[in-house]
Amino acid sequence: MSPVADRSFTDFTQTRWSMLRQLQSARAPDVRDALTELAVRYWYPVYAYVRRCGHRSEIAQDITQAFLRQIADDLRSSHAQPPGKFREWLLAKLNAFLAGEWRDLAEGGQVPGAPPLPQLEARNRSEHVPGESPELAYRRSFALEVLTRGLKRLRAEAGDAGHLGMCEALEPFLTREPLPGQYDELSRKIGVRPLALVMALKRLRQRFRELVREELADTISSAEEMEAEQRALFAALDGKH
């Protein structure tokens, strides 16, 4: 799937770094929910990086919890807008954290929303690439998080519209072209004409790309950064630095 052409729907005054601004402005009753969402979104890319740095699974889980807890605390105590791309900012913060006295901080309590360790390790095994650097593992995991969130939203929209079955049938072709004969085979399987499948796939791809852009918009500071971040996303998925 190639990067998407520029669109004007993104309002960066409302979407840029929205997760971080939520943490900064959260009142006490809202802090738990804000921290939970931060943890759920970015937990695994951080965990994958720490694991590739050579830490055992239990230690990597403790480091990830302590790091995200510290990030949330730092953001709530400052109203300054962190500069640049969230992906790069988070990695720089993580490297600084690992270079510091993280062992004392890792003794803190559990972050709400923390994924269970068996789930993290199952994903680590399934996504492991021999010889992959910590940074590339982080970037690839971050890209997969963005795509996964976009896909979940696409499925939800299709379900609300009563088209979940069609969406699931065409999902394998959102990022690649069908092989010769696959349209006809799928047409017979679900009872829809091939031309209707072609049109449905075109609409699903367009909406999927829009949703991915919306997810990326939450992690960058300006519209000018969108195309560069999309290129970085697909480069990470291709295994390029």
Q: Predicted segments — roles?
A:
Residues 1-241:
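Intrinsic, short, N-terminal disordered tails of RNA polymerase sigma-factor systems
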